[in-house]
Each structure stands twice: as C-alpha cells, then as structure tokens.
Regions:
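N-terminal signal peptide c-region/cleavage motif recognized by signal peptidases
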Residues: 2-4
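Glycine- and aromatic-enriched low-complexity segments, predominantly in secreted/extracellular proteins
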Residues: 7-148
Length: 148
C-alpha cells in the first residue's frame, strides 16, 4: 500500500562576489552583466569585458573607448542583468532604464564596509580579509607545523 518515493533536490548556488569590479553596486552575490544607462554600455563581469556599439557592431573590449574618457565609472549607475547576451535586447534596456541616467546615488563595492566584499583584491579592506583567512585555522591545519 505504501510506495517509497525518493526526492532529489538540486541547489545551484552561484557566487562571484570576489570577482565583481569594485565600481560595481553592492548587494549582489552573483552578477552576469552590468548595464550602464549613462553611456549605453554593458559589462560582462565574469569575462571582465565592456560591450559597446561601434559602427553598428558590438565590440568586446577590456577597456572603454576614448569617447567615454570623461565618464566616471564610480559614480555612474549600474543595472545588474543576469541573463545571457543582454546586449541583443539593448533597446529594451535603453527604454527601461533611461530614468537612471545621471543617478549618482548608488553605493559601490569599493565604499562598502561589508566584509564579504573584502575578498576582492582591489577593495581597500582586502588585507583585512587576507589576514582573517590566515587566522581561521585556529591552530588546526593552518600550515604552522610543530616540531617535537
């Protein structure tokens, strides 16, 4: 009368807090892309690439082109986008986030006092994170061998 049923639960947790740029917004454990409405540019977080239109083609580059030399990436608003190839729907993002142009009230990782961001090697508190990693062993297997 009784049937045995087995359930399998798969939990996929993605984290990339330590690899997000320090100019990115706080509050996200994982980010695929940022969209920057001020300059209509995407940034691929895992690949560390800017994606922008040039002569009708999407360009993937490690830095912004010279036409954005006056853009302050620390102050510009960034929209977190976690979907594949959002630049293929750029018109949707332009329209949806046009109201965020010139919005400079977003807290960025570099200015955060949240210790989860200290893992980022470019964060001002990174050395505190490194020190905490070195002292987490509490004398058990932390590489400090003992001679008898």
């Amino acid at each position: 009368m009784f049937q045995n049923a087995q359930a399998q639960v798969h939990v996929n947790v993605r984290l990339n807090v330590g690899t997000q740029p320090v100019w990115g917004p706080v509050g996200y454990d994982y980010v695929d892309y940022y969209y920057m409405p001020d300059i209509d540019v995407f940034y691929n977080v895992p690949r560390h690439q800017y994606i922008y239109l040039q002569s009708g083609h999407w360009i993937f580059a490690s830095s912004l082109p010279s036409r954005y030399h006056s853009y302050d990436i620390n102050r510009g608003y960034k929209v977190v986008v976690n979907e594949p190839t959002p630049y293929h729907n750029a018109a949707v993002y332009r329209t949806k986030y046009a109201g965020y142009k010139n919005n400079h009230g977003q807290e960025i990782i570099r200015n955060s006092h949240d210790s989860r961001y200290w893992e980022n090697k470019n964060h001002p508190e990174h050395n505190k994170w490194k020190a905490s990693q070195n002292s987490n062993g509490n004398g058990h297997g932390n590489g400090n061998g003992h001679k008898n």
